Every structure is written in structure tokens, then in C-alpha cells.
Amino acid sequence: MPEPHLTTWQLARDGDVITTPRGQLYPVRLPDGSAAMLKVSTDAEERNGHRLLRWWDGDGAARVLAHDGPALLMERAVPGDCLRDMSIQGRDAQATAILCGVLERLHRPRGAPPDGLLDLNWWFSDLLTPPIALSPLLEQCRSLAMTALEAQIEARPLHGDLHHDNVLDFGARGWLAIDPKRVQGDRAFDYTVLFTNPDLCGPGIQVATDEAVFEQRLQQVCVRAGLERPRLLRWIAASAALSAVWFLADGDAAPVNLAVAAMAVQRLAEASG
């Protein structure tokens, strides 16, 4: 329940609670009347998101106003356009440009990173040592992941889960990221999650699995982020495969992740053949 934090931080409720699989979000007003969002996490890993949000200090990410245990008080996004709808409605290149712009800000050089970040070798442990039998495609992706992890460059703190529902419109402050993981490693990895979205943001969405969309995104991200095509493709295959393993290990299907992984593997094969 949020009551202790509502009292301590002198917050007033300002809308219905939003329940997610990992906690609750409470729209609130600060003592000066400005809008904010109180997030109370029930997931232990989710509670670590404050580390990077506080380190970014509002540059490319939502600003943290207060933090105490599972409770995180942040500035609140404004109603309006969202990247999920933008992509679905045929403006995917615009959504991709916004996501790339946010990552450029998050990846800017800063001081010493916060404590408690985990490296990508740990993040990929379920693909490297899988809890399920892997298909030939996933075995290929596992090999590509090992290659990518061994060849990491430009290591820095990463968002780890930057997709269309994790970048919101904050009005005059622009588009900002929320809900980071606590990982660090090759910056190219941070551009991979967008390739399986917005399809994973909700049922019935079919954007990321379109061959033309995949190719357009690939070209756009390579140019915007200054990434070589093979390097990005290896990370896309690895990232999509890791997510697929998580789905499959939970007994769920993973059609989006498998389709994206296959497109990445196919393009790598074409380039080397």
C-alpha cells in the first residue's frame, strides 16, 4: 500500500491505480501541485531501476524525485502520442528515430557508474546455459551471442529494455526512458530490443516481423547509431534468442522473437556467403 509514502512525501492521489505484473503505479500530485508518478514495485529486480535513473539525473530518462525501498517517485509523462501507436500507424521510422535519440542521450559519457550493475555475460546466462533444449536457430543465435559477448567494445551502462512502451512523452522535457534494467556492456545491445517491438507490447501487433520494417530499421539504426551492420545483427539475433528462451522456458510461444532472430541470422548468412 502506498499510504506511508503518500504521507511522508505529502502526495495527493490524482487518478486510478495502474496495476502491472511487477507492481502498482499511482498518479499523484506534489505539494506544489505538479504531476508525478509513485511506483511501488513488488519485483525484487524491478526495485533496482532507481540506480540508473538517479545516475542519469533526468538526462534522457524520467527524473527521480524520491526513493525509498520499493517506492520510487518520478516525474509523470503527459497524455498524448505514444511510440507504440506511432509504429502501428505507419510512422515506424519516426518512432525508431525517437528511440535512437533517447539512447544517444543515455549513452553520453558521465562519471563513475552506479554500484550494482550486472554485465551482459550474466544477462545472457539463460541463452549461454539454457534451461531448455535449443532449436537449430537458437543454437545459431547462442553461438552469435558468444561471439558478440567476447568482442564487446564501447562498454557503458545500458538501459537494457528500451522499447516503444518504455519511452514516454514528457511534454517540454521531450521523450524520456523509464524502467531500465541494471546492466552494462556493449552499447550496440541497447538498440536490439526495439527490433522485437512494439509486437511484444500487446496482443495482435504485427510490425516487427515485417521484412521491410526490419530492413528499414536495420539501415536506420546503423546510420543513426554509427554501428556496423554485422555487429548489430549479431546482437539482434542474440537478444531475440534470449527473449525467446525466456518465453519458451515459461511454456509460452515466442513467434515474434524467433521471426526476428531468423531475419538477423539470414542477413548475416547472406553477407558472409
Predicted regions and their residues:
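An alpha-helical support segment within catalytic cores of ATP-dependent transferases
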Residues: 2-4, 111-160, 170-171, 223
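Active-site Asp-x-Gly
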Residues: 170-219, 223-229, 234, 253-260
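ATP/Mg2+ or Mg2+-diphosphate-binding catalytic cores
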Residues: 243-273
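A glycine-centered beta->alpha junction motif in the catalytic cores
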Residues: 43, 71-92, 105-112, 122-132, ...
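Soluble or luminal CAZymes and related metallo-dependent hydrolases
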Residues: 44-45, 94-98, 137, 210-217
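A conserved alpha-helical element in kinase catalytic cores
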Residues: 32-73, 81-106
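Conserved NTP-binding catalytic cores of kinases and kinase-like/nucleotidyltransferase enzymes
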Residues: 1-61, 170-172, 264-273
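Active-site acidic catalytic loop and adjacent metal/ATP-binding pocket
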Residues: 24-29, 64, 143-189
